[in-house]
Swiss-Prot record:
Its EC number is 6.3.4.2. CDD domains: CTPS_N, GATase1_CTP_Synthase. This is CTP synthase. L-glutamine binds at Y59, G363, L391, G392, M393, Q394, E414, R471. One of its GO terms (cellular component) is cytosol. PANTHER family: CTP SYNTHASE, CTP SYNTHASE-RELATED. Allosterically activated by GTP, when glutamine is the substrate; GTP has no effect on the reaction when ammonia is the substrate. The allosteric effector GTP functions by stabilizing the protein conformation that binds the tetrahedral intermediate(s) formed during glutamine hydrolysis. Inhibited by the product CTP, via allosteric rather than competitive inhibition. Mg(2+) binds at D76, E146. Residues 1-272 are annotated as: Amidoligase domain. It comes from the Bacteria. It comes from Chlorobium limicola (strain DSM 245 / NBRC 103803 / 6330). Homotetramer.
Length: 569
């Protein structure tokens, strides 16, 4: 199999409206090319001025995806990793803020020899250097670059100009542009409208870029007549107009693009020949399990602070898709707003009716903390499968301290610096840190598991590596009273100082982790903790259904009614 002499570049842009799915398109194309034997990497360029998304609100940006090397990046990198089963890195995500920062730093060091620093050429040249960086350092055949934003946005123009110049320098056989547009369906007229796509291509042409391939998102499949019309008015071959209609799950997108022969059109245009046929048997089986689960469905409640915006929990939600397929069930998600549970009259039994497991999600700040703690207490006392991630694990230790260890005023110093029992405290090396951006404990770190624990049972090994994003940790001063009351510290850092995993032995499934397992779950490698949690929730759900059959019933568990002293203020 002959490798291409030069790395081939594919740039993915989007038009008409945002949130069309450029990330899913890029990941799907990358997966198809990889399945043909090509070595593929994907990178994301964001036009905002922030250096990285690490300090951005989840309401504006969604989740922050952390790589092994500690980069805080765009959530689209999660799609890249889940689809390609390849790790990304710091160089996989570039923001305009980082570009400007680099240019200004160079100017301060005198590297421009006293010249007037301008967008053209200095900023554009910096972007071009970064665009080629991954291609130079990686062992690659194809590099896919997703350009964030929508054609017409002012902030995206430098990226587009850099792409235009690169195509001129490299030649059309080494770089192509795939433009993703929207073809709306007008119900009143019962037809698809191509005019928005035509206008989007016109705006792209104004930047000097003629798209090589058009991918058209639509509610309904595109007819041959529609494709011919789009091709005719957008100056592309109708074979290069790819339809991408709505589907039940994002994991069907690669199969739809394969049917539309997008990968073959890309390979032909880039001169890539003699590569194998893709073997997507596993992918088809996975999609079949997602769409037609053998054992029915269960519901998992995700308790969080940002439930109005599900993208804040994107990797967690996708991890449940993977774990559901591996357990032959569909996992339905019920988002639980933590603040709602802080009222004294909150009815947990009603809110959690039909819920077979509770995950308390990551987050920062004191808003909604007492609600999270009450959800954890309910899960612990009612023996409902519980899974806490990062802040969720910290809240679990606070709840355990207050209601089991009788440390009534226990808290985290993040929420109460003068708490009498600081069971969660700022990490020692964080106490002198002043800046917020990029200063947390970030990236992949090793963890040693305790033999005989639930964590060891699901991982089936002693040493694991997981990704982190936190400043606070469990306070080791309180280890003894916790262990005396039944808490197991089943995972720690290799030196034993930092608590990574806590669990309860006398519970159906009660596990809290300081790290972020959702960042390492992939289609072909479901994360063992998510698999185990869904398995426990499935057993709990099916057990409840058996109990509800019309046979002699046992006495029901008493309803949960926390004392006033336990409720948040």
């Amino acid at each position: 199999m002959a490798r291409p002499k030069n790395v081939k570049h594919i740039f993915v842009t989007g038009g008409v409206i945002s949130s069309l799915g450029k990330g899913i398109l890029s990941a799907s194309l990358g997966m198809l090319l990889k399945s043909r034997g090509l070595r593929v990497a994907i990178q994301k360029y964001d036009p905002y001025i922030n250096v990285d998304p690490g300090t951005m609100s989840p309401y504006q940006h969604g989740e922050v995806y952390v790589t092994d090397d500690g980069a805080e990046t765009d959530l689209d990198l999660g799609h890249y990793e889940r689809f390609l089963d390849e790790s990304t890195s710091q160089s996989s995500n570039l923001t305009m803020g980082r570009v400007y920062k680099s240019v200004i730093d160079k100017e301060r060091r005198g590297e421009y020899l006293g010249g007037t620093v301008q967008v053209v050429p200095h900023v554009i040249d910096e972007i071009k250097d970064r665009m080629a960086e991954l291609a130079k350092n990686g062992n690659l055949d194809v590099l896919i670059t997703e350009i964030g934003g929508t054609i017409g946005d002012i902030e995206s123009l430098p990226f587009l100009e850099a792409m235009r110049q690169m195509k001129l320098e490299m030649g059309e056989r080494n770089l192509l542009n795939i433009h993703l547009t929207f073809v709306p369906y007008i119900k009143a007229a019962s037809e698809l409208k191509t005019k928005p796509t035509q206008h989007s291509v016109k705006m792209l042409l104004e930047t000097g870029i003629q798209p090589d391939i058009l991918v058209c998102r639509s509610e309904k499949p595109l007819s041959r007549e529609i494709k011919n019309k789009v091709g005719h008015f957008c100056n592309v071959n109708d074979l290069d107009v790819i339809g991408l209609n709505d589907c039940d799950t994002i994991y069907e997108v690669p199969l739809m693009l394969l049917k539309e022969k997008l990968d073959l059109r890309v390979m032909k245009k880039l001169g890539l020949k003699k590569f194998k046929e893709p073997n997507l048997i596993y992918w088809r089986e996975f999609c079949d399990k997602v769409n037609h689960p053998r054992d029915g469905e269960i519901t998992i409640g995700i308790c969080g602070k940002y439930t109005e915006y599900p993208d804040a929990y994107k990797s967690i939600i996708e991890s449940f898709v993977h774990a559901g397929a591996s357990n032959n069930v569909r996992v339905n998600i019920r988002l639980l707003k933590a603040e709602d549970a802080e009222g004294k009259t909150f009815d947990f039994a009603k809110e959690l009716e039909g819920v077979s497991g509770i995950l308390v999600a990551p987050g920062f700040g004191d808003r909604g903390i007492e609600g999270k703690i009450q959800y954890i207490r309910y899960a612990r006392e009612q023996n409902i499968p519980f899974f806490g991630i990062c802040l969720g694990m910290q809240c679990a230790t606070i709840e355990f301290a207050r209601n089991v260890c009788n440390l009534q005023e226990a808290n985290s110093t993040e929420f109460n610096k003068r708490t009498r029992y600081p069971v969660i405290d700022l990490m020692e090396h964080q106490k002198k840190v002043k800046e917020k951006g990029g200063t947390m404990r970030l990236g992949s770190y090793p963890c040693i598991l305790r033999e005989g624990s639930r964590a060891y049972a699901v991982y089936q090994k002693f040493l694991i590596n997981e990704r982190h994003r936190h400043r606070y940790e469990f306070n080791n001063t309180f280890r003894k009273p916790f262990e005396e009351n039944g808490m197991i510290f089943s995972g720690t850092s290799p030196n034993g100082e930092l608590v990574e995993i806590v669990e309860l032995a006398n519970h159906r499934w009660f596990v809290g982790v300081q790290f972020h397992p959702e960042l390492k779950s992939r289609v072909q490698k479901v994360h063992p903790l998510f698999h185990g949690f869904v398995e426990a929730a499935k057993e709990y759900s099916f057990g409840k259904r058996q109990m509800e059959l019309p046979v002699e019933r046992s006495a029901e568990m008493p309803s949960f009614m926390p004392a006033e002293s336990d409720m948040g203020q």
